[in-house]
């Protein structure tokens, strides 16, 4: 009896499982929460069944690039190489602070006048975002509670979420002058 290799080749890992597996691996190799530059990695899935249990060897994580500005990193044409992998990973560190909400005249507003880095309740954070054909997921880890993670299975919104989606889904079209002739 022959093994159905086609079926086993189509087993896919969920984005949230990829994110937690990648983050756990990077957490063991990174020093602290103060990386000065955002990093881009490519991930090859070696064993999709081992991703959810964080099995050693389930993923191959390849460093691709880094930049002082996460948005410039994601927008760089050279970052498109990440799409050659099963998933792309963005890792960045920074400050997080609570968003205070106020209700004035039946309208809810947020007080974002104080940057997170200057907020009295600021916390150092490391963010890992994974994007693949099946979606986006992210994992946060705070310096003051390094044994705990906060996960998001794809509901994040905002400029970083848009930039990550654009990296994966919006290939850059480059037309050279020679092709116009």
Model-derived segments and spans:
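Glycine-rich, aromatic-bearing surface loops/beta-hairpins
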Residues: 103-181
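Hydrophobic side chains in beta-strands
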Residues: 43-44, 92, 131-132
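Short, surface-exposed beta-edge/turn micro-motifs
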Residues: 36-41, 85-87, 123-127
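Eukaryotic short linear interaction motifs
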Residues: 49-52, 99, 137-138
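N-terminal interaction modules that seed assembly of large macromolecular complexes
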Residues: 24-74
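Short HxH-centered metal-ligating active-site micro-motif
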Residues: 68-108
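Compact, glycine/acidic-enriched structural inserts
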Residues: 4, 9, 59-64, 151-163
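Short N-terminal edge-element motif at the start of the domain
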Residues: 1-34
């Amino acid at each position: 009896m022959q093994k159905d290799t086609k079926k086993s080749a189509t087993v896919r890992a969920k984005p949230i499982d990829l994110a937690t597996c990648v983050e756990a691996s990077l957490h063991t190799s990174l020093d602290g929460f103060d990386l000065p530059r955002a990093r881009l990695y490519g991930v090859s899935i070696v064993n999709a069944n081992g991703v959810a249990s964080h099995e050693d060897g389930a993923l191959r994580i390849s460093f691709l690039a880094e930049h002082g500005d996460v948005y410039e990193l994601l927008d760089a044409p050279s970052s498109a190489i990440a799409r050659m992998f099963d998933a792309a990973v963005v890792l960045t560190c920074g400050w997080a602070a609570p968003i205070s909400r106020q209700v004035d005249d039946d309208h809810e507003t947020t007080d974002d006048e104080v940057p997170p880095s200057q907020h009295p309740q600021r916390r150092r954070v490391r963010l890992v975002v994974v994007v693949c054909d099946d979606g986006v997921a992210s994992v946060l880890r705070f310096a003051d509670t390094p044994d705990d993670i906060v996960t998001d299975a794809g509901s994040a919104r905002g400029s970083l979420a848009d930039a990550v989606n654009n990296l994966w889904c919006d290939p850059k079209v480059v037309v050279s002058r020679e092709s116009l002739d």
